[in-house]
Amino acid sequence: MSQSSKTLKNMSKVNEAFIKPFPSSNKIYVQGSCKDIQVPMREIILTDTIGELAEKNAPIHVYDTSGVYTDPNVKIDLRKGLGSIRSTWIEQRNDTEILTKLSSNFSNERRDDAELDVLRFEHLQVPRRAKNTKNVSQMYYAKQGIITSEMEYIAIRENCKWQEYKDQIGQNEGESFGANIPDVITSEFVRDEVSKGRAVIPANINHPETEPMIIGRNFMVKINGNIGNSALGSSIEQEVDKMVWGIRWGADTIMDLSTGKNIHETREWIIRNSPVPIGTVPIYQTLEKVNGIAEDLTWEVFRDTLIEQAEQGVDYFTIHAGVRLQYVPLTINRIIGIVSRGGSIMAKWCLAHHTESFIYTHFEDICEIMKQYDVTFSLGDGLRPGCIADANDAAQFGELETLGELTKIAWKHDVQTFIEGPGHVPMQMIKENMDKQLKECGEAPFYTLGPLTTDIAPGYDHITSAIGAAQIGWYGCAMLCYVTPKEHLGLPNQDDVKQGIIAYKIAAHAADLAKGHPGAQIRDNALSKARFEFRWEDQFNLGLDPDTARKYHDETMPKQAAKTSHFCSMCGPKFCSMKITQEIKTIDAGEIAKIKAIQIEMDKKSAEFLKNDSEIYMKEGA
């Protein structure tokens, strides 16, 4: 038995650092119309303002992606997986059935292989599928006028109790570039957006552990975190750890991009322990099944992979259906030809067979599979630019136009769909991408990798890309795929995952502020108030990364007394602008009267000066 196998057999607990509650925070649940709709949020408890400005500060509620991992009342056992949230809702709709056997040949082969027992997730669930090839997608329900429990859950979650603060805290006016963001998100608004294809709810019926979330430009900007093994490294336990770590810091969805060993088993462990939607690129595993030879790929093997992953519970598939034979020659004169793994695989297949890809020709067959499990399309940008010199070229935009055509086909089948975008794009060319996507794809949600705005900073591409991510998020991009410092350099570790997610949480939040998303500024204002009042602990705790903020402060002022001091090590006690401003704010009425009297006299002298032709010296004889 390998060391990895031994570890898996005993893998029940999560690293304590991954699940400890955030400081001064409570996990709260807001109940919906029935008891089984319990929407999680994080409540940040604030200290009172003291001194002459004394007042109580209400707690701040923030969107929480960490699932039950940060709930001290829930015992986590990775071997058993998470509890089901949506099973009852799915059963009550009475349009699915539990299968008597797995539908995928590959799944059955893996299950029958006794040598894999040491790697297998122990508590495998029996998958569901729509009855009689019915449609069980959230889009189908939305078009029927049905508000599902998932939609109600999302409405509560998106509002995040911000209405409690609306009379207390102001917000700058935003520019939403034609988005339609209401003051209050209602269940009906969620239904309407999904029915029109402007938003998606990735929620496979075989992933009932998910806490429902939504992706669309009229909702908060979301971020995705990538994990996954490679042929050169990582293990099942490391990938599960990365998933838990990623959602702690704010990943709204996770993509498992595994290309190494035991992809099937790795994915099962991740899905069963994930409270957020899981996405994959099915062509990666399909390629593994044909021993890495792209020319040997077939529709039959790909179809079996789709069914295998749908029955495991994958919530969205990246499908590179827009890589058409006619677009491949357009990439020849690029500096960096085709950088998408999936795109390059399909381009090679198209050239080898000199025909359109089986993904493109069988697209409606794929829709038939997706709708029976409610798997969402993430239509992949296989021809995205890999450097800023290649941005916005004919290959990229030709593929985007095809994705728009495929979106309409998916919608005809009531299959939820969003669109993937670049890539590497300089700042002045980003808005063109967003505008063209909205036009070509009928306002289907856009999901971009950055984009990276410059190519000169290996090791810092979480920054080069977060700049572009904030910008395109402002213009209307619905979800941002994070980039880590290891981009272009290697497989990210846990610290890289955190760095990438924090950079993208900043970008997404900055975009929400710029759009004028209701309630987006509450946290900023609360932190600013804490900063002005020298409530250091509140400053740390309101931040996206309290641990790092506290660490940086304590490097120069480590003593507990420094947590109440009215200065930091940057300015010291004599030059703190906020301390001086506080003193100005506490000037008494008598002093203010003196200042006003002086101003009146100054105004008189000014008028007298102007009356005398604005001359510094009096003219002779005057």
From Swiss-Prot:
Q: Which GO terms describe its cellular component?
A: cytosol
Can you quote the record's cofactor note?
Answer: Binds 1 [4Fe-4S] cluster per subunit. The cluster is coordinated with 3 cysteines and an exchangeable S-adenosyl-L-methionine.
Q: Which reaction does it catalyse?
A: 5-amino-1-(5-phospho-beta-D-ribosyl)imidazole + S-adenosyl-L-methionine = 4-amino-2-methyl-5-(phosphooxymethyl)pyrimidine + CO + 5'-deoxyadenosine + formate + L-methionine + 3 H(+)
Assembly and oligomerization: Homodimer.
Q: Which family does it belong to?
A: Belongs to the ThiC family.
Residues binding [4Fe-4S] cluster are 568, 571, 576
Concerning InterPro entries, the annotation shows: ThiC (IPR037509), ThiC-associated_dom (IPR025747), ThiC/Bza_core_dom (IPR038521), ThiC/BzaA/B (IPR002817)
Q: Mind telling me what this protein is named? A: Phosphomethylpyrimidine synthase
Q: What is its EC number?
A: 4.1.99.17
Q: Name one GO molecular function term.
A: carbon-carbon lyase activity
- Which cofactor(s) does the record list? [4Fe-4S] cluster
What species does this protein belong to?
Answer: Ruthia magnifica subsp. Calyptogena magnifica
Q: Name one GO biological process term.
A: thiamine biosynthetic process
Q: Where does substrate bind?
A: 226, 255, 284, 320, 340-342, 381-384, 420, 447
Q: Which domain of life is it from?
A: Bacteria
Q: What does this protein do?
A: Catalyzes the synthesis of the hydroxymethylpyrimidine phosphate (HMP-P) moiety of thiamine from aminoimidazole ribotide (AIR) in a radical S-adenosyl-L-methionine (SAM)-dependent reaction.
Pathway in which this enzyme or protein is active: Cofactor biosynthesis; thiamine diphosphate biosynthesis
Residues annotated to bind Zn(2+): 424, 488
Q: Which Pfam families match?
A: ThiC-associated (PF13667), ThiC_Rad_SAM (PF01964)
Q: What keywords appear on the UniProt entry?
A: 4Fe-4S, Iron, Iron-sulfur, Lyase, Metal-binding, S-adenosyl-L-methionine, Thiamine biosynthesis, Zinc
Which cysteines are cross-linked by disulfides?
Answer: none
